[in-house]
Amino acid sequence: MSHSEAMKAVAVKAKEASRKIACADGTARNAAIIELAALLEQEKEFIFAENKKDLDAAKERGLDQARLQRLEITPSVLEYMIQGCNEVAGQADPVGEIEKMERRPNGMMVGKMRIPLGVIMMIFESRPNVTVDAAVLCLKAGNSVILRGGSEAIHSNLALASLLQKALGKADLPAEAVQVVEVTDREAVGELLKLDEYIDVVIPRGGEGLIRAVVSQATMPVLKHYKGVCHMYVDSDCEIPEAMDIIKNAKTQKPAACNSLECLLVHEDIAKEILPSLGVLLGACGVTMKGCPRAMPLLGPKAIAADFDDWGMEYLDLILCVKVVSTQDEAQDHISRYGSNHSEVILTKNHDRAMRFIREVDASMVGVNASTRFNDGGQLGLGAEIGISTSKLHSYGPMGATELTSTKFVLLGNWDVRN
């Protein structure tokens, strides 16, 4: 069977299953998710053994330590997956919810009902836990899912998918609602991205190169963010000790996260007061500071001059660009030019400036006096998330189960005809 035929067979199975899973009762979908949590605990030795196959092969191929860490399923990672299943199962069912039911002047009732998107394809790198996270959210929202993880995690992904399918079967739901692409070469992905007749949306998670490749080939809508170039603007009217704590958290808590701070903009009236201390604080944390000409003398002797390419760079590392600005206008113009619509924050005691920042800055999360690290489904009250979208269509920001649904109009008439 050719790649084209094999991938079409996968998509057809997912499409057929999507009709059944969409009509299934929410109780059955929750039962499958709870059963999966139990299976993850019961079959943990099997999971660890399959994951070890991937780790051993990755070490032989010379994968770097960061990618090996993302690939490994540790006991704590597995426990997090189990907790995520139970948390999602406990959430309200988004499917079938009717919103804004209103009576029209002609007496008819009109509203909107939440419905599944259909078939969602997830393309992701390295992290096998995404197999469970993505599938559980898709199932919660009544969707079927096609999972295409990185080739380096093939044994782990297949093991986890087998448990997902087993859990679906025990809940009397179609096992075909979860499909894993077993072919590891990239040609298979290209074939799937042509199948908009069967696949309703694709969500890529990984590096910017992967995401741009998916966008360039996909014939169906893509929910994505290319990168997280997150800014923080320190206003002249600011609590300096608290601001320094927030900046440290945003940069150093998890520098490889897409919601970590990459560029700090500081008002000139407060720069001399905050930047020398900040240079010492972040320097002690191993952060390399790259500054504009006005920031360089204030950041300490280890600071490096920023060049043009540094603005707009997603480092995902202990590197921070710092720019001194004269006005809030200049700060917001910089964000507009170099930002990626991900997470942007202002630190200020001035209410009017904060509200202006919220109104005018375009990002999936705009914050006041808080770390950029809060742009996360769990922190924003969504529970687990399938990813963060910086595409305003169909969703903007972290995507939980509700964001994996759409709406249809519901019309309740009384034997009405249109005049």
From Swiss-Prot:
Main location: cytoplasm
EC number: 1.2.1.41
Record carries keyword Transport: no
GO biological process terms held by the UniProt record: L-proline biosynthetic process
This protein's UniProt keywords: Amino-acid biosynthesis, Cytoplasm, NADP, Oxidoreductase, Proline biosynthesis
Pathway: Amino-acid biosynthesis; L-proline biosynthesis; L-glutamate 5-semialdehyde from L-glutamate: step 2/2
Pfam families for this protein: Aldedh (PF00171)
Annotated InterPro entries: Ald_DH/histidinol_DH, Ald_DH_C, Ald_DH_N, Aldehyde_DH_dom, Glu-5-SA_DH, GPR_dom
Compartments, as annotated in UniProt: Cytoplasm
A single MF term (Gene Ontology): NADP binding
Catalytic function, reaction form: L-glutamate 5-semialdehyde + phosphate + NADP(+) = L-glutamyl 5-phosphate + NADPH + H(+)
GO cellular component: cytoplasm
Class of the enzyme per the UniProt entry, highest EC level: oxidoreductase
Keyword Cytoplasm (UniProt): yes
Spans traversing the lipid bilayer: none
Function in brief: Catalyzes the NADPH-dependent reduction of L-glutamate 5-phosphate into L-glutamate 5-semialdehyde and phosphate. The product spontaneously undergoes cyclization to form 1-pyrroline-5-carboxylate.
Family designation: Belongs to the gamma-glutamyl phosphate reductase family.
PANTHER family: DELTA-1-PYRROLINE-5-CARBOXYLATE SYNTHASE, GLUTAMATE SEMIALDEHYDE DEHYDROGENASE
UniProt-recorded name of the protein: Gamma-glutamyl phosphate reductase
Native source species: Maridesulfovibrio salexigens (strain ATCC 14822 / DSM 2638 / NCIMB 8403 / VKM B-1763) (Desulfovibrio salexigens)
Organism phylogeny: Bacteria, Pseudomonadati, Thermodesulfobacteriota, Desulfovibrionia, Desulfovibrionales
